[in-house]
UniProtKB/Swiss-Prot annotation:
One of its GO terms (cellular component) is extracellular region. It catalyses: a 1,2-diacyl-sn-glycero-3-phosphocholine + H2O = a 1-acyl-sn-glycero-3-phosphocholine + a fatty acid + H(+). InterPro entries: PLipase_A2, PLipase_A2_Asp_AS, PLipase_A2_dom, PLipase_A2_dom_sf, PLipase_A2_His_AS. Its cofactor is Ca(2+). Binds 1 Ca(2+) ion per subunit. This is Phospholipase A2 MALT0035C. Transmembrane segments: none annotated. The lineage of its organism: Eukaryota, Metazoa, Chordata, Craniata, Vertebrata.
Length: 142
C-alpha cells in the first residue's frame, strides 16, 4: 500500500474513533415538537421549552417551578419508564401520530416501545397546552 493510501486510511480511522464518542442526538424531538405545535398552535417548542424551569430541556433535578415544569418532570419520568419497562431509547424512537383539531392521536405504532414513547409525548403535549407559560421561568431553576 502506498503512503498516500495509508495516510487517508489513518485519517478515516481517527475520524471514526472521534465520532464514536459523540452522543447520539435525539431523533424524536422533532416529532415531540410537532405534537406541541398541534396542541399549542403558533408555539416554538425548541425555543420555548428547551430551558424552562428545572425539568424542561436536558436533564432535570430539584423542585419544579410551576405546572408547566411539572409536565416536563412527568415527561422525564415517562421516558425513564420507557427504558425500564421496554428497554427502548425514547430519544431515538420514531413513532407514528396524527394531529387534528389540536388533538394528537398515536396510531400505527408496531412495537410497545413506539406506542409507549408516543403516549409519553402525547400526554406531555396535552399537559403543556393546559399549563400557563411564565417567561420568568425560562432559564430559571429556583
Amino acid at each position: 500500500m502506498n503512503p498516500a493510501h495509508l495516510l487517508v486510511l489513518a485519517a478515516v480511522c481517527i475520524s471514526l474513533s472521534g465520532a464514536s464518542s459523540i452522543a447520539p442526538q435525539p431523533l424524536n424531538l422533532i416529532q415531540f415538537g410537532n405534537m406541541i405545535q398541534c396542541t399549542i398552535p403558533g408555539s416554538s417548542p425548541l425555543l420555548d421549552y428547551a430551558d424552562y424551569g428545572c425539568y424542561c430541556g436536558r436533564g432535570g433535578s430539584g423542585t419544579p417551578v410551576d405546572k408547566l415544569d411539572r409536565c416536563c418532570q412527568a415527561h422525564d419520568k415517562c421516558y425513564t419508564d420507557a427504558y425500564r419497562f421496554y428497554r427502548c431509547w425514547p430519544f431515538l424512537t420514531l413513532y407514528s401520530h396524527t394531529c387534528s383539531n389540536r388533538k394528537v392521536i398515536c396510531r400505527g405504532n408496531t412495537t410497545k416501545c413506539k406506542a409507549f414513547v408516543c403516549n409519553c409525548d402525547r400526554v406531555a403535549a396535552n399537559c403543556f397546552a393546559k399549563a400557563p407559560y411564565n417567561k420568568r421561568n425560562y432559564n430559571n431553576c429556583k
